[in-house]
Each structure stands twice: as structure tokens, then as C-alpha cells.
């Protein structure tokens, strides 16, 4: 049975989707069977793996709201499988609000396919509302991207409070799978200080690999290609491949 890992941080612009996309591609290249479930209405993870949002037959919205089997919505790509998102998902919170077990809809959708994958990443929206709560209830662990910049730790206390609440009341198996340091600038002492602070806050949970600031990471999504393929030797690509090695080792 594979693991479900929610990639979550309620702050935007921390490298959440970039991490989800590139770790999916890098782990797939290592021979793992990986699914990226795009649970963000912006659907950037969907397009980041080369899936044309205009041409998908079903999305995660149809799976969670209309009970379409997840298998019917999954799109296979050269970089891993994708359970695509769409703008319709933005209205899912309103549609689910009066539903029984509204926080369990994603869990119900993913359970039938969980055993077919080594790893399922869930790319969460940058907020702590019902969609993210669904992801936390469905997951075995969370991966938290934290940018090595000012205010990096701001808001993480809210995330940790939510994590503790979900673990206590809804999903006792939920753990911190790992913390990924992103947007690291080795030219500044500040990035190093933030990295040290994050490691102090999450002892034993922070990946050794840090993801540097890298122009190729910003360019790759516009081509619908993971940076691990777009520019295999770039610093961003090398970092995500090394982080994928760390994740694979944790799964064994």
C-alpha cells in the first residue's frame, strides 16, 4: 500500500506546486509509481506536468463532487500520473458544506487507487480551508515547503495547530513526512539563518537537500515540463533529484 503525502503550506509562493511537480517527475524517473493529485483550483500542477486543462474529460472536482471513479479521471504523462484539477474545484467548498463527512471526500476518492501507487502527492491550495482539510484527512503525512526568506515561519504555527487537531480528531496516522527548504540563496547569510531556524523548529524532519533560487525553476512551468527534464543539469533540477533520492530512501 502506497503513501499519500499532502504538499501543504497556507502561504503562497513558497514552492509548493513546484516541489509537487518536480518530485513527482524525479521519483517517477527513479522507477516509482507516482500520482500527483492536483487539489488546487488554480490547477498549476496539472499544467506543470504537461496536461492541457482544456482537454481533460474529468477532474478531481468530478471525482469528489460527482462520484466519478478516480481511475476515470487520471491522466498518464511521461513524468508520472496526474489526477487533474480545474477551476470548478473553487466552488467545491460551498457544494460540500452541507454534505455528511464533507472532510472525507478526497479520502473516499483515493482509497480505491492507493494500492496501485508507491506514492501519491496531493498539491493543496494555499489556505487552511475545507479542501486542505480533505487532503489532511486523506494523507499519511505532509510535506511542508518553506522558503528561505523573511517571514518564512510566519503562519506555520497555524498549520501545526491544524495538523495537531486533524491528528487528534480525524486522522491519527497523520505525521510530518518532511520539510523542504526552497528558494535558498547561498550568497546571503539570511537564507542560511532561516534554514538553521527551520531545522531547529523541525528536528529530524528537514531534508538535507535545499532547493536554490534558480531561473530554470521559474521557466519550466510555462513549457509544461518539470525542471528535471527541462534543464537536467540546472541547480534546481539537481536539487529535486537529490531530494527525490532522500524521499525514496524514507519509503523503503
Residue positions per predicted region:
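P-loop NTP-binding core
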Residues: 1-252
Amino acid at each position: 500500500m502506497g503513501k499519500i503525502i499532502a504538499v501543504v503550506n497556507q502561504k503562497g509562493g513558497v514552492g509548493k506546486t513546484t516541489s509537487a511537480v518536480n518530485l513527482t517527475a524525479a521519483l517517477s524517473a527513479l522507477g516509482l509509481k507516482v500520482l500527483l493529485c492536483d487539489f488546487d483550483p488554480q490547477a498549476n500542477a496539472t499544467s506543470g506536468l504537461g496536461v492541457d486543462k482544456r482537454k481533460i474529460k474529468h477532474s478531481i472536482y468530478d471525482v469528489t463532487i460527482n462520484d466519478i471513479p478516480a481511475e476515470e479521471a487520471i491522466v498518464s504523462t511521461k513524468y508520472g500520473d496526474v489526477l487533474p484539477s480545474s477551476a470548478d474545484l473553487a466552488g467545491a467548498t460551498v457544494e460540500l458544506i452541507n454534505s455528511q463527512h464533507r472532510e472525507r471526500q478526497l479520502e473516499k476518492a483515493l482509497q480505491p487507487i492507493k494500492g496501485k501507487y508507491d506514492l501519491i502527492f496531493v498539491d493543496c491550495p494555499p489556505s487552511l480551508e475545507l479542501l486542505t482539510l480533505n487532503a489532511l484527512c486523506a494523507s499519511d503525512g505532509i510535506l511542508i515547503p518553506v522558503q528561505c526568506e523573511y517571514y518564512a515561519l510566519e503562519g506555520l504555527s497555524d498549520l501545526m495547530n491544524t495538523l495537531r487537531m486533524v491528528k487528534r480528531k480525524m486522522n491519527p496516522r497523520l505525521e510530518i513526512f518532511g520539510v523542504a527548504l526552497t528558494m535558498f540563496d547561498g550568497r546571503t547569510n539570511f537564507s542560511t539563518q532561516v534554514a538553521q531556524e527551520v531545522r531547529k523548529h523541525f528536528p529530524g524532519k528537514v531534508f538535507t537537500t535545499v532547493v536554490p533560487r534558480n531561473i530554470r525553476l521559474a521557466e519550466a512551468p510555462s513549457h509544461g515540463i518539470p525542471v528535471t527534464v527541462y534543464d537536467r543539469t540546472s541547480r534546481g533540477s539537481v536539487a529535486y533529484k537529490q531530494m527525490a533520492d532522500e524521499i525514496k530512501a524514507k519509503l523503503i
